[in-house]
């Protein structure tokens, strides 16, 4: 898609900020780590509580660096080189930002301002619709207070792994935001009677399907009849 790939290494930082780690986030972090490793990027999961025990499979994932210190401590001498991906930012992320910044910081799901949480719609054969809204802590607003330069990834809400993927495509692969192929609000078939609409924008894969973390669809299907807030 792009004519040139930046030789500058990309450092991705996700500020965890939570005392626990849900199954959803664990799959996202594993996906981010694998893709970062494959692309030669660095992935740092910061502000991880010392009391948090990482799942064994996640801890063994290539490309994952766990840091108990905060972003402010780790990059105290390079604050001007840190870019916060922020839905409230006034400037869209561009390929040139790969030369201006060294660290790209994420605080969770990115998109609507204010964020609208997660909305899952289950459609059954009798047209009954179940809507579940799960609110995550507004991590980005906390990071915004620290004064980092902000960039926006467009108007649609993205999962954390999608936001990282899009950022890497823009700043490392030099693909402008508007040239990336997306799928908005795809539906996942749960069974012959139910399907779930995902309230996010995803990158379209080579198979024309949304790119999701390995195991995510199985996780959604498994917990479709339970509290999805347990996944977050």
Residues covered by each model-derived region:
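A short acidic, amphipathic alpha-helical/loop segment
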Residues: 27-32, 95-97, 142
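Structured adenosyl-cofactor binding patch, chiefly the S-adenosyl-L-methionine
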Residues: 140-190
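Hydrophobic/aromatic-rich, well-ordered segments within soluble, folded domains that form packed cores
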Residues: 124-150
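Glycine-/small-residue-rich active-site loops that bind phosphorylated ligands and cofactors
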Residues: 20-21, 111, 158-159
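Core subunits and conserved enzymes of cellular information-processing
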Residues: 2-48, 52, 60-66, 70-71, ...
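Alpha-helical interaction elements in eukaryotic regulators
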Residues: 25, 118, 135-139, 159-163
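Short beta->alpha connector loops at strand-helix junctions that form conserved
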Residues: 15, 107, 123, 151-159
């Amino acid at each position: 898609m792009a004519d040139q790939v930046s030789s500058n290494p990309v450092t991705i930082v996700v500020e965890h900020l939570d005392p626990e780690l849900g199954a959803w986030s664990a799959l996202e972090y594993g996906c981010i780590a694998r893709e970062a490793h494959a692309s030669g990027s660095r992935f740092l999961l910061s502000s991880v509580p010392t009391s948090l025990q990482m799942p064994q499979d996640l801890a063994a994932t290539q490309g994952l660096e766990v840091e108990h210190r905060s972003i402010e401590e780790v990059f105290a001498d390079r604050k001007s080189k840190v870019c916060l991906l922020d839905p409230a930012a006034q400037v869209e992320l561009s390929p040139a930002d790969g030369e201006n910044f060294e660290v790209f910081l994420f605080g969770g799901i990115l998109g609507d301002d204010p964020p609208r949480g997660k909305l899952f719609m289950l459609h059954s054969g009798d047209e009954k619709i179940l809507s579940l809204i799960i609110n995550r802590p507004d991590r980005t607003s906390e990071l915004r207070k620290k004064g980092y330069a902000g960039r926006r990834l467009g108007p649609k809400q993205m999962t954390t792994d999608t936001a990282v993927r899009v950022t890497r495509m823009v700043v490392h692969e030099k693909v402008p935001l508007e040239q990336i192929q997306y799928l908005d609000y795809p539906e996942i078939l749960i069974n012959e009677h139910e399907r779930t609409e995902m309230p996010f924008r995803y990158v379209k894969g080579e198979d024309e399907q949304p790119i999701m973390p390995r195991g995510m669809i199985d996780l959604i299907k498994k917990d479709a009849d339970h509290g999805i807030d347990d996944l977050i």
